[in-house]
Amino acid sequence: NMIFEQLFDTKSSTYTYILSSGKGREALIIDPVLEHTDQYINFLNKLELKLVKVIDTHIHADHITGLNELSERTNCTKIMGENSKSEVVDLRVKEDENVKIDNINLKVMYTPGHTDCSYSYLMNDRVFTGDTLLINGTGRTDFQNGNARQQYDSIFNKLLKLPENTIVYPAHDYNGKKPVSYTHLTLPTKALV
C-alpha cells in the first residue's frame, strides 16, 4: 500500500510530502522544512522507510530547507531542477525527466514564474506544484527572478492542461486557516479554472 503523507508547517505555511510505495520500502520527501527534520525521521523510522531522495521544488525564500540536514542524517540524494543556483544539490533534473523510487515515478515539469528555478512533479493523477500554483492563488512573482508572464504560461499552458481530475498538491497555504491536523489541502485542476 502506497504511503502518502502531507505535513503542514504553521510558521511558514509550508506543505511537505512524504511518498513511499509501502512499509519497509524506499521513500522520497518533497519540500522539507528544516525545523521538522526530526518529525520526518521519526515518521520514516516508524514505518521502516529508507529515505533515498529529497526534492525542493524551488529555492524557498520563506523557510530554510531541510535538504542538507536530511541528507547528512540519511545519506539521501538532494534533487532540484537544472536551473537551480543552489550549490548543495546532488542531482539536477530537467523537463520530462523522471525521478523514481521503487514503483513511484515523478515526471519533471519546468514551471517557472514564481522563481526561475520552479519545477513541478507529476505522479499519475497528482501534481506537486511548489509555489507555482496554490489552491486559491499563485506564488508571488515580484522577487527571486520571478516573472508573471512565465507564471501564466506555466499555469495555463502546462499545469491546467493536465487531465482535469489531476489533484494539485501545493507547497503552501497562506490563508493560515488550516490547523496542522488538516492534512489534505487539494483540489482537482478542473476546480481551479
Q: For the regions a protein language model found, what residue spans apply to each?
A:
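Core dinuclear metal-dependent hydrolase active-site scaffold
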Residues: 18, 98-123
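Ser/Thr-glycine-rich phosphate-binding loops at phosphate-binding pockets of nucleotides
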Residues: 52-58, 111, 129-130, 171, ...
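Anionic-ligand binding patches
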Residues: 162-180
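Active-site HxH/HxHxD metal-binding segment of metal-dependent hydrolases
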Residues: 13, 24, 34-110
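Conserved beta-strand hairpin/beta-sheet module of binuclear metal-dependent hydrolase folds
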Residues: 2-50, 120-130, 136
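Conserved small/polar residues in nucleotide/adenosyl-binding loops
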Residues: 183-189
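An active-site-proximal "capping" alpha-helix that borders the catalytic cofactor pocket
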Residues: 145-168
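Active-site metal-binding loops of divalent metal-dependent hydrolases
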Residues: 32, 59, 83-84, 115, ...
